[in-house]
C-alpha cells in the first residue's frame, strides 16, 4: 500500500495535526485479550505463533476489530532478527526470552536466508493489509540493533546489562553492524509487502551513557533510516528509544526518524518544547491496567498538551497482560471523542 494514505501516516508525513487524535497501543494484540488467549491456547511455542501466517493475521486484527484502533501493528517480536541470525531463541512462560548467549560475531549467520525465513510474517503483512480498512495504518517493526544485541549477548532480558557493557567493543560493534544489515533488509521487505508505517523499538536504549547511546543507538538507527529512505524517500518511521531521557532530543535531531514515541517518564511539557517532530505516547501502562479513573484523567491531560501538534496517542510502553479490556475500551472511546 502507498504510504501516506492512512491517518497515522498522513500525520507523520505532513508533520501537522490531523483533526481527531488517532490511537493505537503497543502490544495491543496479546495476552490482555480473551480472543488472543483462546486463539493460542493449543500453541506451546511462541516463535511458532510468530511464523504462522494465518494466526499472525488473526492476532494482528483482533484489537482493531474489538476496539476500532486506528492502526494495526503486525503481531511479531523484536527477536525475530535474532532467530534469523541463527540464535537459539526460546520463550519461557512467566520468564520471557531465553537465548543461548552469543560470544562472537562469527556465531551469527549472514542475511542470505532472511526473506525465506521471514516469508510467513511478510505474507501475514500482505493479508492484514488486504483486510484492513484503507484509512487504518499497518505498522511493521523491528528491534533497534543495540536492543537486539543486548538480548543475544546477555542471553535474555537484563536489569544490569553487565555482560553486554563489558563485551569486547570491537566484537559488540560488529554484532550491531550485522544486526543493522539484516534489519534494513527485513524492514524494506515489510514495506514491500504492505506496511505503511515502521516503528523501531530500542527498548534498552536507557541503559547507555551519552557516548555509547550515540554509538550504539543513534548511528545504527541513522543507517537504517537512510537505507529505507533511499528506497522510499518520505516513508514514515517512528523511533522509540525507551528511557533515553534528555537524549530523546539528540535522537530526534540526529537519526532522521519521522516521529518519536516517548515513554511515560518523559515530562510532556519538556517533550513539547524540545522534540520538534510528530510525537507518540505516553500514558503509563500501569495506570491503564490498575487505575482506570486516573488513566482517563491522565489521557485527557496528555491530549490537552499535544492536540495542537502532530500527535498519535499511545502508551509509554506496551499493554500489560492483565489490563482489563474494559479499561482499554474506555481509553479508546475517550481519545476518539475528546
From Swiss-Prot:
Record bears the keyword Lyase: yes
An MF annotation (GO) of this entry: uroporphyrinogen decarboxylase activity
Chain segments annotated as transmembrane: none
Main location per the UniProt record: cytoplasm
Location(s) in or outside the cell: Cytoplasm
CC terms in the record's Gene Ontology section: cytosol
Entry's family note: Belongs to the uroporphyrinogen decarboxylase family.
Oligomer status and interactors: Homodimer.
Name listed for the protein in its UniProt record: Uroporphyrinogen decarboxylase
Organism: Wolbachia sp. subsp. Drosophila simulans (strain wRi)
Lineage: Bacteria, Pseudomonadati, Pseudomonadota, Alphaproteobacteria, Rickettsiales
